[in-house]
């Protein structure tokens, strides 16, 4: 499978500005730490991490529409246009759709994204409280 990482990064930077891409970089760094001893699909996590907030960015944002729901729409459309395999697309969509969820039946990839997103939201003080 071909993941056009340059295009995804460019779209995240263009639409999400500095906050979007910096948020993604922090999440990927956190996932490297919290997922260190885990067996997970790094491609799914990489794509889901970049796309999980797309519905809240720039021209993709729709007032009154939850950013998670909108991200599912935007990311789904993008991945279909790019020809991602259905099982990969479904896995990424699960990660995006549950990144604010406490559903215990999520995949390890979805849990890693959700946990990293929560830790990033808490900030440094919040992270230090955990350890």
What feature does the model see in each segment?
Residues 38, 43-131:
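Divalent metal-dependent catalytic cores for phosphoryl transfer on phosphate-bearing substrates
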Residues 2-31, 53-63:
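Active-site flanking loop/helix segments enriched in acidic
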Residues 9, 28, 32, 72, ...:
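Amphipathic alpha-helical segments within well-ordered protein domains
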């Amino acid at each position: 499978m071909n993941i056009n990482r340059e295009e995804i990064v460019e779209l995240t930077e263009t639409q999400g500005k500095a906050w979007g891409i910096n948020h993604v970089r922090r999440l990927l760094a956190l996932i490297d730490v919290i997922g260190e001893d885990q067996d997970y699909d790094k491609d799914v996590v990489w794509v889901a991490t970049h796309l999980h907030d797309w519905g809240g960015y720039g021209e993709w944002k729709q007032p009154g529409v939850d950013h998670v729901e909108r991200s599912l729409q935007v990311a789904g459309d993008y991945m279909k246009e790019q020809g991602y395999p259905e099982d990969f697309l479904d896995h990424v969509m699960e990660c995006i759709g549950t990144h604010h969820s406490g559903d215990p039946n999520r995949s390890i990839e979805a849990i890693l994204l959700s946990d990293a997103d929560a830790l990033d939201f808490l900030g440094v003080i919040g992270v230090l409280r955990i350890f």
